[in-house]
Amino acid sequence: MDKEEYISSLIDSMQTTIDTFNKEVLIAINRDEAMLKEKAFSAYAFNACLMGVDFVYINVCISALAALKADNEHAKRYHWKNVVAGISEGIKYIYTFKENEKKTLIRYLTTILNDSGIMIPEITKSLTVLQDLLDKFTANWDGKDMRDIALHYDKSTEKLIKETVGITDEGPYATLLSDFLLIMNILHSICMYGFLQSLINRNLSFNDILQNETSRYVGNDKHKKAIHALLKEDKFKIAIEENLEEYGKRFLDSCSVFEKLHKVYELLGCEGELKLSNNHFGKLYKLHNLYSLVLYSMLDLLSITDSYLSSKTELEAALNMRYFLIVKTSVLTHIVGYTEKEASISLWNEIKGFIPESDPQLHDMAATMDSYLRESVKDQNIKRKRAKLLHLSFSKNKPGDVKELLSVLDTFDPLSEFYKVLDLIKLLVKVIKFLDRLIVSMDKEVTIENLKHLDKIRSMSSSLRDMIECYVKDKVQKEELLTSINDNEFKIIDLLKGVSTDK
C-alpha cells in the first residue's frame, strides 16, 4: 500500500469513527433527557460521563480528519494545531494537568464504580492501565504553547514560526493522536460498562431508555441545509481554496523577511536591541511581525471555513461551526479588541503607530478602516458565548456538560454566521491592503537607511582588512580572518538588499 492509499484508508477509518461517535453522543444526550436522576443515579452519572468522553473524542477526531483531508499546507497545519488544542482541553476535562487535583472525571468514575458495587478486577486493571497512560502522556506533554496559539493567538511571529510553521512532519502529531485515542477508548469502555451494569442492577434494559439518535440540539439538519445551499455554487469553495494558496504564500514570504531582519541584527551583533529599536529597521521588524500575525489570522479563518463546507454529518458541521465562531471572536479580539483595554493593545492600534506623519493619504485610509473595524466588534455578547463554546468543564454535578455547549451553539444561525465570517475575511483583506501600502511607504525610508548601513559596513570591513594586513604576520591566520570578514560583509549586504526588495 503506497502513501496515498494509506492516507485514503485512514480518512475512511476516521470518518467511520466520527460517524459512530456522532450517534453515540446524540443517543447519550437523549438518554440524559429521558432518565430520571433520582431513580437511577448511577446509570445517569455513567451516561453523563459517557456523553462528555465521547464529545471530547469526536471533537479531536473531526480536526484530525480535516488535517488528513487538507491539501493546502497551512490548512493542514491549522488542523493539527487544533488537534493539539482539542487534546489539551480533553485531558484537562478528564484528568487535568495539575498535581493532586481531586475534581477529575477519572476520580469521579472510580468513586461511582465503587459506590455502585460494580468494581470488578477487569475494570480495576483497566483503570490502572488508564492511570499509567495518563501519567506518561501528561509527563511528556509540551503542547501548551500550541494550544494557547490555537485558541487565543499570540503577538510573536517567532512563536508562530516555531509552533506552527515548523509543522512539516505529520508523524509526531499522528502518534500523539494515536496515544490520546487509546486513552479515550479505554475511558469509553469503562463508562459504557458502568452504564450497562447500572441498568442491570436497576432491572432496566435498553428498551426502557431512549436509543434514538436525533436531538433537539442538532436534530433539524440546519447545518446540512446551509452547507447544501452554500455548495450549490462552486464560488465559495473555489474562492476559499484560492485565497488559502495566495495568503499562505504571502504569510511565508512575510515570515521570511522577518527572519532576514533577525539575521541582519545577529551579524551586526545587536539582535537584543532589535525589538526596542525605533530606527527604520526596528520599525520594519515590528511591522512585519504585525503583518505576519494578520495573515496568520486570515489563514485560520479560511481553513476552518473550508472544513465547515466539507462536513459530512450534522454534529460534525456543528462542531466545525463552533470552531469558526471561536476563531472569529479570537481574531477580532486580537486585531481590534471588544473593550477599550483590548483595543489599546490590539494589532490595529500598533499598526496605526507606524503611519508616517508625512503621509496624509494613509491617515485618511486609517480613519476609514477604524470605522469598519469598530463596527465589527459591536456585539459584546459574543465573547460570553465564546467562553461557553470553548471550555468543557468537569464538575461532580455536571460530569457531561455537553448539552449546555450544544444549546449555546444551537442559538446561532449557520448561514448568518457563515456570511459574518466571510465579511470578516473581506475586512482582513482591507487591513492587509492597508499594510501593503504602509510597508511601501516605510520601505522608502528603509532603503535610504540601508544605503547608510552599507557604507558603514564597507568602511568597517575595509578598516579591518587594513589592520589584518598590517598586524597579522601568520599567512594562514591572515587568510582565515580576511575570508571571514569578506563572507560576513557579503552576507550582511545580501540581507540588507533582500529586506528592502522582499514584500
Regions found by a protein language model. Give the residues of each.
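Amphipathic alpha-helical interface segments
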Residues: 1-141, 165-381, 396-503
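Substrate-binding/catalytic groove segments of enzymes
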Residues: 151-162, 391-401
